[in-house]
Amino acid sequence: MKMTTEEAFVKTLQMHGIDNAFGIIGSAFMPISDLFPKAGITFWDCAHEGSGGMMADGYTRASGKMSMMIAQNGPGITNFVTAVKTAYWNHTPLLLITPQAANRTIGQGGFQETEQMALFKDMVAYQEEVRDPVRIAEVLNRVIMNAKRLSAPAQINIPRDVWTQVVDIELPVPVEFERPAGGADAIAEAAKLLSEAKFPVILNGAGVVIGGAIPASMALAERLDAPVCVGYQHNDAFPGSHRLFAGPLGYNGSKAAMELISKADVVLALGTRLNPFSTLPGYGLDYWPKQAKIIQVDINPNRIGLTKKVTIGIVADAKKAAESILAKLSPNAGNAGRDERKNLISTTKSRWAQELSSMDHEDDDPGTTWNQRARASKPDWMSPRMAWRAIQSALPKNAIISSDIGNNCAIGNAYPTFEEGRKYLAPGLFGPCGYGLPSIIGAKIACRDVPVVGFAGDGAFGIAVTELTAIGRKEWPPITIVVFRNYQWGAEKRNSTLWYNDNFVGTELDPEVSYADLAKACGLQGVKARTQDELRDALAKAVEDQMKHGKTTLIEAMINQELGEPFRRDAMKKPVEVAGISASDMRPQLLA
């Protein structure tokens, strides 16, 4: 069938139902963007490509539907780097479209030219370049299928002179693969271990959310009366109200989860790669059960046993593996110590809930006094934990929330719980700043009838602040964003107090800047909240305005400068002076 290359490209997108694109317009892909309105594809023209990529990540994580990111070759595409790597470690299937300089000029160092395939080589699960216009639909179809199968971004690189050619082409037919269920022997061995366990624990990861495995993991947990922990930043991987939910592991997570998993003799790590950062000690507890037998279920065989010693590895979809293991359990599975285990789960959770509700402030390490000084300098201001408690009291139960990297969002890791998956959009283990705002925008585009609230510290928010200039237009849906305002890069400042004698280099932000006023200047609502009551009421009104009146609100939550536990206590140490450094050794540069 004869058609243009751009028609073949867009028809392939339509076959896969990919109807949302995020980026900034550029001449290198105008032949296809010209067809987007006719094709039913919405192009979301953000203020910066990096934020556009994170919008795409938020859209797909909230909805489960693939979206695409696209921009001008060269500098437009390089702006996607952080977003693509973020999506890679969030296991988000995305289509990365990278228009390229024309074939006839590649290699000449021409306008907006760079090696785009090499750039993303370690950031995507699959990449391919269109070598022949006749193959454009075939290549695009294969790239999309690999993104789906590998649950990660995949890249198609398209020299711009491929467009506007008439080709005789047969559109490909998408071939869906059944996700693996795990080997029969491995499933049987896992069921045997869990049947004989005296203190089984289930650890749910991102694969449980992505694979829709929460009901299957719940059935397995209830059969065994096993506590269920969730991985770092995966608070939505099990219902928060369930009696067996112990909470998140990792940085500022649930002490109850840490205490319970430390007692495990068998751990079922379901849909998780067991990232080492997710199991670092917390609250002084080195809780990972080193003597326990570990069953790791992951759809990617390369990640099984990569970070932890594993007894049984199962290459499988989390839902299918959980269902198969449940079916193979012995009649007496879970009976050993069942009553004692149930009581311990209940008392441990209750004790932690009481402790968490009473935690108002951050502790100082011996020999340091920053948090004490921070409280004294602003005695009437909220602490980060006070702010998080106020937020929890006003947050709708069905809300989708996002968070950012940084001190104040991380302090809140133990607080939010959810009743279903695809509700918590944390930045993930690549750890980019500037994720909270764009990801929640993407989530709202995907889920118009659901309230959404994004969170960010003021340092991280500054990286994505330009999106305020984009989202006030009438076609953009309303959102709510809370910015924790304490005028500092908090995580780095905590490092400075612990290891660098309060030598604060690059940690201070401008107190004269008001994000609330900036939001107003962009035609949005901007509010400052100075107390818990003000924050609770402002959030409740902002959500109401979002859902009933179509208004976007930015809330500046004014908090004191308390600093939480350092992110990388495991990787930092106090410097030692040997040769010494003096400003007198600085020499003037010799200019050409």
What do the predicted segments below correspond to?
Residues E6-F9, Q14, I24-S27, I32-P37, ...:
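Active-site diphosphate/adenylate-binding microenvironment
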Residues I97, T105-G107, F111-Q112, I261, ...:
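Thiamine diphosphate
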Residues M1-N332, T369-W370, A394, W476-I481, ...:
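N-terminal alpha/beta PP-like core and its mobile active-site loop of ThDP/TPP-dependent enzymes
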Residues K2, H48, Q108-G110, F177-A191, ...:
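A general structural motif
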Residues I144, E189-A191, K255-A257, Y283, ...:
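Generic recognition of flexible, low-complexity loop/linker segments
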Residues S278, G282-L285, I325-K342, T347-A353, ...:
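Hydrophobic, well-ordered secondary-structure segments
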Residues I24-G26, W44-M54, M69-G76, R131-D132, ...:
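Active-site nucleophile and cofactor-binding loops and adjacent substrate-binding regions
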Residues T5, V134, N157, E170, ...:
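Phosphate/pyrophosphate-binding active-site segments
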